[in-house]
Amino acid sequence: MKAKLLIMFIALFALAGNNGVNAQTKKKKNQPVPAEAVDLGLPSGTKWAPYNVGASKPEEFGDFYAWGETKTKNPLRYTKEDYRYYKNRREYVNIGDDISRTEYDVAHVKWEGNWCMPTKDDVKELLDNCKFMWTKVNGVIGGMFTSIINGNYIFLPAAGGPWYEEHRYVGEIGKYWLSAQDPDDNFNAYSLVFGSNRTFWGGGYDRGAGQCVRPVFKK
């Protein structure tokens, strides 16, 4: 009798443990999608998310992703060799010149609908129509982009990013993936980059590195 009770107890304990793991997994998979995007009055009608993929507030870093990957990983695994599309030391697998709204677009995969990674044109439009200010929000350093059209703004934290054994440039630089691969170098993709006195976008950023993603909303 005691043996049967012990077996039942172990079974119930295991079931409860599995439910706890499943609940945590489910919770982690649920991405907090914004109720609405921020309208900066941009000519194209494109709107920007108020926070990053994996975050729930503008000042939160959210999750870090290698370019074209849609899952997070151990910070020590943001390397060339651990990149999902690593082919060999001379090249990465080509997954497309622009991955916006594809299976490789983490914003589109996680948030679905009309959300996607920003393109080069989206970021150019943002910089052409917004004033940039290096500032703090709730103690977090980052960049404020304020529309010169309607005064609305978005804040992007200077989250830096993981690369090999370091998480670099926290509070110093913001790096955000764009949807375009660098046409001049298979290893690299485009990013929006900003610091205390400079904001620009361009290629030259290794696709295997971890960066934040700030989605845009397009109808």
What positions do the PLM features span?
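Bacterial Sec-dependent N-terminal signal peptides
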Residues: 1-27
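Conserved positions within compact, well-structured domain cores
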Residues: 25-219
